[in-house]
């Protein structure tokens, strides 16, 4: 594979991957880099995907593309560690972070980021989802994301630029990562992005939200999305016990109010009695987003109660 000298690289596109076929994404991004005309590199870090054939196919495509590297971890390290590893490995002055379950939908994705590179320390391009549900087993995630997409227009994200932060599709100066890192204590799914946004704010890093969205294609099944939600709520509870993310999440803030009102015990009991009914709805073909919000709140309260009892 052709390589540029270390001092020649202007832009590094950095992709975290775990069990996703990212061949089309690599080909599309490589084409974008060629049209952009600058000197760049693409680096993929595979977080020890279990599907060997899929990984082999990704590596095969990466090796056929100039200035593209595909690395594989020897064990699963989590998104936060992987993003820090990629930032350290990158040779470009500017870094574009992308999740592997993304799809490029317009020809000026790279050029658009490059055009606005001096506007802020971090540019957030955003994301959107398909207009129709590709899988009836993914109805909960589809409905949840489509509702969230209404708030993902750049000007709406800009109202609260740090609280709307997601690392799914961002561009940053490499210098940023000498001051702010993804928190590597976030080993499991959830909240590493939000915590990074909090740290950016603390360090006075500027964020600018632009319309340069990628399509998110990784719609989990209802079962998978609920499992991920449970893991993310445990992550949030652990972070808050360490004094992090205080006041930075809606579900955590509401749980705090319920605790101040002396109703946490009652909420925990209600969850025990209604968990089965809630899951029956959420795993079905017509899940309610209202019930999903109720589930998350009650689940978080229960997780926190269990953690408090263990620590006593």
Name what the model sees in each region.
Residues 1-31:
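N-proximal low-complexity "stem/linker" segments adjacent to membrane-targeting elements
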Residues 29-72:
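Acidic donor-binding segment of Leloir-type glycosyltransferases
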Residues 73-90:
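Glycine-rich, basic loop-to-helix element that forms the pyrophosphate-binding segment
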Residues 95:
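Short aromatic/hydrophobic "clamp" motif used to bind/position activated sugar donors
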Residues 107-139:
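Conserved donor NDP-sugar-binding/catalytic core segment of glycosyltransferases
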Residues 142-162:
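Short, flexible, basic/aromatic active-site loop/helix in glycosyltransferases
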Residues 188-196:
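Acidic donor-binding loop at a coil-to-helix junction in glycosyltransferase catalytic cores
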Residues 231, 248-312:
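Non-catalytic, C-terminal membrane-associated alpha-helical segments of glycosyltransferases
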């Amino acid at each position: 594979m052709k390589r540029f000298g270390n001092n020649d690289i202007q832009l590094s596109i950095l992709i975290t991957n775990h069990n996703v076929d990212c061949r089309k994404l690599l080909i599309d991004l490589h084409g974008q880099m060629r049209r952009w005309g600058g000197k760049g590199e693409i680096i993929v870090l595979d977080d020890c995907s279990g599907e060997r054939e899929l990984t082999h196919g990704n590596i095969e495509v990466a090796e056929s593309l100039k200035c593209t590297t595909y690395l594989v971890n020897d064990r699963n390290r989590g998104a936060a560690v992987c993003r820090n590893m990629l930032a350290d490995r990158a040779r470009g002055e500017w870094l574009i972070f992308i999740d592997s379950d993304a799809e490029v939908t317009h020809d000026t994705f790279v050029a658009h980021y490059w055009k606005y590179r001096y506007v802020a320390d971090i540019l957030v391009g955003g994301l959107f989802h398909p207009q129709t549900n590709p899988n009836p087993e993914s109805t909960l995630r589809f409905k949840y994301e489509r509702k969230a997409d209404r708030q993902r227009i750049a000007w709406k994200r800009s109202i609260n630029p740090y609280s709307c932060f997601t690392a799914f599709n961002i561009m940053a100066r490499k210098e940023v990562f000498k001051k702010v890192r993804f928190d590597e204590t976030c080993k499991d799914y959830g909240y590493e992005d939000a915590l990074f946004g909090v740290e950016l704010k603390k360090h006075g890093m500027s964020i600018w939200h632009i319309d340069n969205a990628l399509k998110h294609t990784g719609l989990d099944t209802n079962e998978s999305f609920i499992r991920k939600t449970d893991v993310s709520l445990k992550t949030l509870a652990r972070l808050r016990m360490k004094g992090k993310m205080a006041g930075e999440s809606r579900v955590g803030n509401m749980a705090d109010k319920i605790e101040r009102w002396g109703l946490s015990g009652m909420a925990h009991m209600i969850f025990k009695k209604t968990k089965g009914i809630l899951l029956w709805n959420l795993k079905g073909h017509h899940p309610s987003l209202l019930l999903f919000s109720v589930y998350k709140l009650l689940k978080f309260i229960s997780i926190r109660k269990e953690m408090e009892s263990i620590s006593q």
